[in-house]
Amino acid sequence: MQRSAKLKIRAPRKFSANQVDFATHWEVLQRAIGDIFQKSTSQLSFEELYRNAYILVLHKYGEKLYNHVQDVIRSRLKEETVPAIYKNYDASLLGNALLDIRKNDSYSTSWSRSLEAAHRFLSSLVNSWKDHIVSMQMISSVLKYLDKVYSKSADKVPVNENGIYIFREVVLLNSFEIGEKCVETILILVYLERKGNTINRPLINDCLDMLNSLPSENKKETLYDVLFAPKFLSYTRNFYEIESSTVIGVFGVVEYLKKAEKRFEEEKERSKNYLFTKIASPLLSVVEDELLSKHLDDLLENQSTGFFSMIDSSNFEGLQLVYESFSRVELGVKSLKKYLAKYVAHHGKLINETTSQALEGKMAVGRLSSNATMATLWVQKVLALWDRLNTIISTTMDADRSILNSLSDAFVTFVDGYTRAPEYISLFIDDNLKKDARKAIEGSIEATLQNSVTLFRFISEKDVFEKYYKTHLAKRLLNNRSISSDAELGMISRLKQEAGNVFTQKLEGMFNDMNLSQELLQEYKHNSALQSAKPALDLNVSILASTFWPIDLSPHKIKCNFPKVLLAQIDQFTDFYLSKHTGRKLLWYPSMGSADVRVNFKDRKYDLNVSTIASVILLLFQDLKENQCLIFEEILEKTNIEVGDLKRNLQSLACAKYKILLKDPKGREVNAGDKFYFNENFVSNLARIKISTVAQTRVEDDSERKRTLEKVDESRKHQADACIVRVMKDRKVCEHNQLMAEVTRQLNPRFHPSPMMIKRRIEALIEREYLQRQADNGRIYEYLA
């Protein structure tokens, strides 16, 4: 059997670099790269060139080939591209133009030549860049195998990308600083466009696209970010800084803002079309800063066309433009609010000062009544100012909530700073809720009540307002002067919404007393004992709880020598009431009642509606002979009425419109020694006459106001004491600052307590043994049950 031959497998033969001539293959590639740069590629064979590169890479010449290609590209750019670009740069024209735009010089004939030179230089640069891009794409295609095998394994950037980087280093960042000159030339062109010239926008866009596609040396940003953006923003700031300072003194505010708005739109359009959108935001910020932010005060303070002037002239279009423009910048709305507060403070001060001066004049001549005219005028002026500004903000400023809040704060400052504001607001409400105001406010009660609540929000001393409001409400209720119960309760409901249940508790108690009094009075009049003997007069009684009503229970206020006919009725009602309410005490308060009295004069009879005190006075003249008089002191002795009440009622009877009595000597004031006669010759066209007590609803004089505030201060002490005890009872132990803060928070809805007041009340409660300090820490309080 014949033996078969052995099969031998040989190892593959190793290729040696020496087997391939690098120079031969490189010469082919080098010549081809040159032809590509020269745009002479018609005779080139892609397959042949690819094969030459493939062989070199395959035979371990990848690194050498990569470096040689890099050197050829660098040499080509340095020796041919850079000189070709630079010869198109007119250093004289463009250099001088750059200096001029920093100064924002006016247009001159040299600008047209600068425009041509700029276009020529940038065109040369852009064309070179585009040619280089095309060339590198072709070279990269030929050397695709080099990138695939060598560049990737050696962690080298691909040939195409490397060629782009070489362009950056050799052309843009060389010693000639072509990149910087490119940016400066773009700045010149943008400047010329801002001045009204037409420029080649696509050319600039190509330049910026080039810069944006080239990474900076740290590769975190592009040349656009490093070379162009900072310098462009700097030159833009300089341009608008000079422009704004030049024109702001020439144009009115509206004209200036319209010009600024036009500039904003131009820059937005410029960013969109050729500057790249990524610079839009910082660019607009720079323009807004220079045109608006740095001139906010200048624009608002302009004497003839500024913010105050626009408000005074109701320039809604201008105010809307101001708001829209100022809303662009960070501090714009804040500045608007500041100047709005200034406007309110200025006009509020005028309102307060003119009212105070007029009030002082009335006090000097003793004329404080006129149905609280001063209070009504003050309120009307404040409301007119509020309505006007509120309308302006709602109409021209999109009802901006922050500006409306600022407006409210400004009104709080000037209204709350006027010490008579709580009294005036209460008098205004009183004036509008009386029966004789029906025609004046018919169909607009809701608006009046809402306006009143608006003013109520502006006062911090709500307890002072409550003091006056209770007094005025009491007079309306007891004298049956309210326009309607619904209107009164509607006002109280609004106050409750604003200040809470506690604030209106006493006001609601007053209404409840009136309702209960009506029920009790009906029961009294149907009482069998009363029915058996017809009374000499018809008695109507209101039972008022002293906790709700603003009643001065001082002995001199409740004393009065009632006539026998009235005293009998008083005793009878007292017996009836005490039979139903054992343990209670009735105090008769003459100064808050009224009476219907039929009086016989020489010609005819008249039915007079007067105060209870006035009826007591009139009855003194019932048995006097003709021409017999009573001296003031006699009336005082016979009636035992408090001097102030007596004088006011005598003024109503002898010094007002209807002179039921005659006074000697004549005059508006009642003094000791004055003589009073019954006016038998009194005549009037009215059969029924209402005689109101003089100054029943008037502004308080200084002494009365002092007494009112003293009562308020005393009430505040009690409120503070109750609040401190309430907090300590709940917490048992509390640190000083925490107690101060909590008490302040709880009392703020009624009044703003000072830290000193709270400290004094704490000390008073410690003395009264409601609280004590901890033995080892005097700043911690303990509640004593």
From Swiss-Prot:
Keyword DNA-binding part of the UniProt annotation: no
Main location: cytoplasm
Cited SUPFAM superfamilies: Cullin homology domain, Cullin repeat-like, Winged helix' DNA-binding domain
Location of the protein in the cell: Cytoplasm
Gene3D superfamilies given in the database record: Cullin Repeats (1.20.1310.10), Cullin, Chain C, Domain 2 (3.30.230.130), Winged helix-like DNA-binding domain superfamily/Winged helix DNA-binding domain (1.10.10.10)
Annotated Cullin neddylation domain residues: 715-777
Keywords: Cytoplasm, Isopeptide bond, Ubl conjugation, Ubl conjugation pathway
Cross-link (Glycyl lysine isopeptide (Lys-Gly) (interchain with G-Cter in NEDD8)): 729
GO CC annotation, single: cytosol
GO BP term, pick one: protein ubiquitination
Post-translational modification summary for this protein: Neddylated; enhancing the ubiquitin-ligase activity.
One Pfam match: Cullin_Nedd8
GO molecular function, one term: ubiquitin protein ligase binding
Pathway: Protein modification; protein ubiquitination
Assembly and oligomerization: Probable component of multiple cullin-RING-based BC3B (BTB-CUL3-BTB) E3 ubiquitin-protein ligase complexes formed by cul-3, rbx-1 and a variable BTB domain-containing protein as adapter and substrate recognition component. Interacts with btb1, btb2, btb3, nedd8 and pip1.
Family: Belongs to the cullin family.
Function statement: Probable core component of multiple cullin-RING-based BC3B (BTB-CUL3-BTB) E3 ubiquitin-protein ligase complexes which mediate the ubiquitination and subsequent proteasomal degradation of target proteins. As a scaffold protein may contribute to catalysis through positioning of the substrate and the ubiquitin-conjugating enzyme. The functional specificity of the BC3B complex depends on the substrate recognition component. Involved in ubiquitin-mediated degradation of btb3.
Annotated protein name in UniProt: Cullin-3
Gene that produces this protein: cul3
